[in-house]
Design a protein with these regions (language model features):
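Conserved alpha-helix/loop element of class I SAM-dependent methyltransferases that forms part
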Residues: 2-20
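Short alpha-helix
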Residues: 145-174
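A C-terminal cap/extension of S-adenosyl-L-methionine-dependent methyltransferases
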Residues: 61, 170-259
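Short conserved loop adjoining the S-adenosyl-L-methionine
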Residues: 68-73, 89
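A conserved beta-strand element that flanks and buttresses the S-adenosyl-L-methionine
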Residues: 80
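A short glycine-rich, Lys/Arg-flanked "PGG" loop and its adjoining helix->strand segment in the class I
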Residues: 92-108
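Conserved class I S-adenosyl-L-methionine
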Residues: 104-136
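Class I SAM-dependent methyltransferase SAM/SAH-binding core
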Residues: 24-68
Length: 259
């Protein structure tokens, strides 16, 4: 297994303890099959844009658009994707779709929009568009058009989920690592620069771990009303969420405006 596959397998085992959990993988490749199989998971459904016939056994594969999944809410215990959201024309929509069909949690592996990555982009030491590694069906939305590499921050992830599901308090967990770029599309001079700064990069990221270029984020999905935000409660008579006006009066000088 490559370093990336070992990280993948290790992280999914950390966050998904039950090997029999129902899991949907978005944008699945053979690396996904290897990671889950190596970690001992049994109930995994792989999905993707295209209809390539690959050796996915013992798992099943279905064709799905990650930004518009055909499944009902809370169909799977967990939904996972590995370096796929940045291939979508709307990565945020892909993330909220994962959240929608998950019951317990969402696990995503992506590139982090760290300060170092922003500097690397500025000096063209890394790609902004995934041109060098693009082949048929690997571009934006499963086409051969190279995608923009959308890199994430923790704040953006949390804003996206809290906007999509504002009633609940969410738990976000992050894990960081580095896959040092080899610059396949760079000139010889820039490759020399990359090799020169390599030890300084690893020293810097050892001190400041969030500056690494790769991370995984786990979003634990609320499973009951105990995780509601304090200004809300579930009305058992109306069978819906309501605003707790007593909480509002106690925490704000004036009642919120009635509409």
């Amino acid at each position: 297994m490559s370093k990336r596959e070992k990280i993948y397998s290790s992280v999914i085992s950390e966050f998904i303890k039950d090997k029999n959990s129902s899991i949907l993988v978005i944008g699945a490749q053979l690396a996904d099959k290897v990671a889950f199989y190596s970690a001992g998971f049994t109930n995994v459904l792989l999905s993707g844009y295209d209809e390539r016939k690959l050796a996915y056994e013992p798992y099943e594969w279905v064709k799905e658009n990650g930004m518009s999944l055909s499944f009902d809410e809370k169909t799977f215990d967990y939904v996972v994707t590995h370096n796929v959201l940045h291939h979508m024309s709307s990565p945020h929509k892909g993330l909220t779709e994962m959240y929608r069909v998950a019951k317990k949690g969402v696990l995503v592996f992506e590139s982090r929009d760290s300060f170092i990555m922003q500097v690397a982009e500025r000096f063209e030491l890394t790609q902004k568009y995934e041109v060098a590694g693009c082949y048929e069906t690997s571009g934006v939305d499963g086409t051969n058009v190279p995608n923009f590499i959308f890199r994430w921050t923790e704040r953006e992830i949390e804003k996206t989920i809290n906007t999509f599901s504002p009633a609940f308090k969410h738990r976000f967990v992050y894990r960081y690592w580095s896959i040092y770029p080899d610059g396949p599309d760079l000139s010889s001079f820039k490759k020399i620069i990359l090799n020169f700064i390599r030890p300084f990069y690893f020293l810097f990221t050892k001190l400041f771990s969030k500056q690494q270029n790769g991370f995984a984020f786990f979003i634990e999905k609320p499973t009951d009303n105990s995780t509601l935000n304090p200004w809300l409660y579930f009305d058992n008579n109306k069978l819906r969420l309501e605003v707790d006006n007593n909480w509002v009066r106690n925490n704000y000088k004036k009642n919120r405006n009635k509409r």
